Regions:
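Conserved AMP-binding/adenylate-forming core of the ANL superfamily
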Residues: 28-75, 79-83, 100-105, 159-162
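Gly/Ser/Thr-rich phosphate-binding loop
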Residues: 268-276, 282-353, 366, 373-378
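AMP-binding/adenylate-forming catalytic domain of the ANL superfamily
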Residues: 142, 508-532, 550-552
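AMP-binding/adenylate-forming catalytic core of the ANL superfamily
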Residues: 99, 105, 116-120, 391, ...
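Structural core segment of the AMP-binding/adenylate-forming
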Residues: 58, 87-165, 489-492
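Conserved ATP/PPi-binding loop(s) of AMP-dependent carboxylate-activating enzymes
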Residues: 360-364, 372-412, 448-450
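Conserved AMP-binding/adenylation subdomain of ANL enzymes
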Residues: 205-224, 234-272, 287
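Conserved adenylate-forming
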Residues: 59-63, 167-180, 184-226, 238, ...
Length: 552
């Protein structure tokens, strides 16, 4: 027996139509660094999204599920792209502007992006890559910035405002299959090449509803959310989609992500909510300590990407900002857990302990812990295992594997289809997750991941280096940073500055990933099967047993 309910597909275009009409007076405010920020209502966002869709279809010839990439900061035009591209049936591909150039080029080519919408200030990042991007036919430039580096581009260059000007402000959005691809993000490639995660209209719609639930972020049209988490970072944790569902106003920082402008926009625009990784909040705390401001409107802060130090959480409590942990990853859209303490703990000593966990699982996320032998680990708050999840907004494969088939590597997906997160932790009987380690030795720095293997391979390509092991060590500012331990070849005398420069120049390692901490060791400790025993190195560092040099 089937129900008598209507079968209406869950589409991003329905979120756009709802937000631009029912919540048409809500606004996206984009910080400009000038006396007055730029303001645009959701009604205007809806009209301009339609114009952009017409421009992409009629002006640039985008058809079907072709990919349109964005290389942009958080701003109103990026929100328009968020809605126009998937609503017309194409696929939004947000590019991580912090990736090394080679990875960016690989990702664009792997996704076969046909159009790139870029902020003018990011042209210096894009222009050198264009000769390596054969699929890109059009470049659309938005906002201030020198266009000169694009003058020799073989792709056609368009101005965003000129491209959409005069086009219809209404679009007959197609009735798509809700399972159709809407957007894609690539993982940061901690093991091998980056991997593409493709989100459906259905998954984004359901995830947005979860973001808005009271036990998640619980935002309404009375709120303004300062969206610091980048729109290229797992769709800004779902906030741009969730906001138009409930009319949440958005304050977008554009490229002004430094502590001083963030403090100024909090004081001037008075957001009630903000979302970012811990390193942003550490910098903001230092700024507010040095130069106090009225930030009393901001009462709720969502932190993800890495754990928030208890001292930072307590410091923001004193400022009246309640920090709330959330956990997720690119493959989980990303919302998996949110750390809102259960009712019985409020006002007790247990409340803060609950807040320090990664949180309780959302209703759409099933979770289990698996031991080394594949055994199921109980939810007892003590027994640790690798976290595996599944649900309607959880990836079941990666995009475009061999023979263009979905890629399901055994280290990422179980035989019965669950996502292996690579995170190790415990789950309490009432469903609160506490992460204790990484299954692999990924370094989480400021909410972004650094591959220890990539650094090791680059180091060991230096002629003076016999072996190299890189491990994560605690860092007050970034959460974790890489420690490079190297074994020099006999007679070699390479200094650390030289090795660091080699990583950047020959190893093509992004500047922010370069280690500051270095040490020479006689040999890399190994396990019984010959693998690097990194826990020994971490213990030696913690106990002060390594002679570490810290570079500036």
């Amino acid at each position: 027996m089937l129900s008598t309910m209507q079968d209406v597909p869950l589409l991003i275009s329905r979120i756009l139509t709802h937000g631009s009409t029912v919540h048409g007076t809500s606004r996206v405010t984009t910080w400009t660094g000038e006396a007055e920020p730029h303001r645009r209502t959701y009604a205007e966002i809806g009209a301009r999204s339609a114009q952009l869709a017409h421009a992409l279809r009629d002006g640039l010839g985008v058809r079907g599920d072709e990919r349109v990439a964005t290389l942009m900061w958080n701003n109103a035009e990026h929100v328009e792209a968020y809605y126009a591209i998937p609503s017309m049936g194409a696929v939004l591909h947000t590019l991580n502007l912090r990736l090394p150039a080679e990875q960016l080029a690989w990702i664009v080519n792997h996704a076969a992006d046909r159009v790139v919408i870029v902020n003018g200030s990011l042209i210096p990042l894009l222009a050198p890559l264009l000769p390596k991007l054969p699929t890109v036919e059009h470049i659309v430039v938005s906002g201030p910035g020198d266009r000169a580096p694009l003058q020799d581009a073989t792709a056609r260059v368009h101005e965003y405002e000129e491209l959409i000007a005069g086009r219809p402000t209404a679009y007959d959005w197609p009735e798509l299959d809700e399972r159709r691809a809407a957007a894609m993000c690539y993982t940061s490639g901690t093991t091998g090449d980056p991997k593409g995660v493709v989100y459906s209209h259905r998954s984004i719609y359901l995830h947005s509803m979860q973001v808005n639930m009271a036990e998640s972020m619980g935002l309404t049209d009375q709120d303004t959310s300062l969206v610091v988490v980048p729109q290229f970072h797992v769709n800004a944790w779902g906030l741009p989609h969730a906001a138009l569902m409930t009319g949440v106003n958005m304050l977008m920082p554009d490229r002004f992500l430094q502590p001083a402008p963030l403090a100024e926009m909090i004081e001037r625009e008075r957001p009630t909510h903000a979302a970012a990784v811990p390193t942003i909040w550490q910098g903001l705390l230092a700024e507010l300590t040095a130069r106090p401001r009225d930030v009393s409107a901001l009462t709720q802060v969502t932190i993800g990407g890495s754990a928030c130090p208890p001292s930072l959480m307590e410091a923001f409590d004193e400022l009246g900002m309640r920090v709330c942990h959330a956990w997720g990853m690119t493959e989980t859209s990303p919302l998996g857990t949110v750390a809102r303490p259960p009712a019985g703990s409020i006002g007790t000593d247990e409340e803060f302990a609950y807040r320090l966990t990664q949180g309780r699982f959302a209703v759409g996320v099933q979770a289990r812990l698996t031991g080394p032998g594949g055994e199921r680990i109980p939810w007892d708050g003590e027994s640790a295992g690798e976290l595996e999840v599944r649900g309607p907004w959880i990836a079941g494969a990666y995009y475009n594997g061999p023979d263009a088939e979905p890629l399901r590597p055994a280290d990422k997906f179980s035989e019965d289809g669950w996502l292996k997160t690579g995170d190790v932790g415990t789950i309490s009987p009432d469903g609160f997750l506490t992460l204790t380690d990484r299954a692999k030795d990924v370094i989480k720095s400021g909410g972004e991941w650094i591959s220890s293997v990539e650094l090791e391979n680059a180091l060991m390509s230096h002629p003076d280096v016999a072996e190299a092991a890189v491990v994560a060590v605690p860092d007050e500012k970034w959460g974790e940073r890489p420690l490079a331990t190297v074994v020099l070849r006999e007679g070699a005398s390479a200094d650390f500055e030289t090795l660091r420069a080699f990583l950047a120049e020959e190893g093509k390692i992004a500047k922010w990933q370069l280690p500051e901490r270095w040490t020479v060791i006689a040999t890399v400790p190994k396990t019984s099967v010959g693998k690097f025993d990194k826990k020994v190195l971490r213990r030696q560092y913690a106990e002060g047993g390594l002679d570490v040099t810290r570079l500036g």
